[in-house]
Design a protein with these regions (language model features):
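Short, conserved active-site loop motifs that form the nucleotide-linked donor/cofactor pocket
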Residues: 93, 120, 184
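Conserved S-adenosyl-L-methionine
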Residues: 123-125, 234-242
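Short internal loop-to-helix segment that lines adenine-nucleotide cofactor pockets
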Residues: 35, 39-70, 135, 151-209, ...
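S-adenosyl-L-methionine
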Residues: 1-174, 181, ...
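Hydrophobic pocket-lining residues within nucleotide cofactor-binding pockets
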Residues: 76, 127-129, 176, 191, ...
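A SAM-dependent methyltransferase catalytic signature shared across enzymes that methylate proteins
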Residues: 117, 227-238
Length: 266
């Protein structure tokens, strides 16, 4: 019986990585594709501008603080951000990463090990408003699909990832507040429409620690999240389908601007 081999080892700009070669969906034009695996296999990297911006913001914090910084990668996928941050910061920081899809989580763990990232803590869980369990789709990883685009909570307008999602599985949900982090310096949320729920579960931590944030806004209401952030004295700066959120007490707030989605830092 044939045994498919979708996972391959790829020498990317981010280091050696386990990548699913079927991690892609075709764009509406039927010619171009998208997906984390697609970018890594066809370009050698994944969203380098976003990676470099976050690394700059992290280094800026690490330079100011007389302690290691803590960063959360919410929706880590196979770990491009996690690995880049971990290698860049080394002993100057630790990364806590969450990935809900079990098979992708296995790849995340493998990639952290391959790149000798000893300053990471990885969880196979979704981020939400509270601890619990969530039934999510279970894609076929032996077939093509943009697995990172899959919404854990499906609805009529959910993005089609390139394959039908008929099977289900159950995963734990975790709330960031339950970890009672002493410090949280940076929070990334790319959780395919569950960003507001993840923020609700991190509300007390955000109020106390005032982390810098990168929040994907493609599948959520911009006005809602802008209002939520403003109520907590954050300014949201648009950046390539995301908000960079900076608290008004942060020294970065006097240095950062955004125009037409382009971030400038003085």
């Amino acid at each position: 019986m044939a045994r498919p081999q979708p996972n391959v080892l790829v020498n990317t700009d981010h280091g050696m990585m386990i990548v699913n070669r079927l991690d892609y969906a075709l764009a509406p034009d039927g010619k171009s594709g998208y997906g984390v695996g697609f970018q890594l296999l066809n370009k050698g990297n994944y969203d380098p501008e976003e990676i470099n911006l976050v690394k700059f913001l992290a280094k800026d914090m690490a330079d100011q603080l007389d302690r290691p910084i803590t960063m959360i990668d919410g929706g880590a996928n196979i770990g491009v951000h996690t690995i880049e941050w971990a290698k860049y910061l080394n002993h100057r920081g630790r990364i806590v990463a969450f990935e809900a899809q079990e098979h992708i989580y296995h790849m995340l763990c493998g990639n952290a090990a391959l790149n000798n990232c000893f300053n990471v803590k990885l969880f196979n869980a979704a981020l939400g408003a509270e601890e619990g369990w969530l039934e999510i789709p279970k894609p076929n990883y032996n077939d093509t699909g943009s697995f990172g685009s899959m919404e854990l909570k499906q609805h009529d307008k959910s993005e089609h990832i390139g394959q039908d999602l008929t099977k289900k599985t159950t995963v734990p949900t975790m709330a960031i507040d339950d970890f009672e982090f002493q410090h949280l310096d940076f929070l990334k949320l790319d959780v395919e429409g569950m960003e507001m729920e993840a923020l609700a579960g991190a509300d007390e931590t955000i109020k106390r620690c005032k982390p810098r944030m990168l929040i994907e806004i493609i599948k959520i209401d911009r006005a809602e999240i802008s209002g939520w952030l403003a109520e907590r004295d954050y300014t949201a700066y648009p950046f390539a389908g995301n908000f960079i959120a900076v608290h008004k007490s942060d020294s970065m707030s006097d240095r950062i601007t955004s125009e037409n989605g382009v971030i400038s830092i003085s």
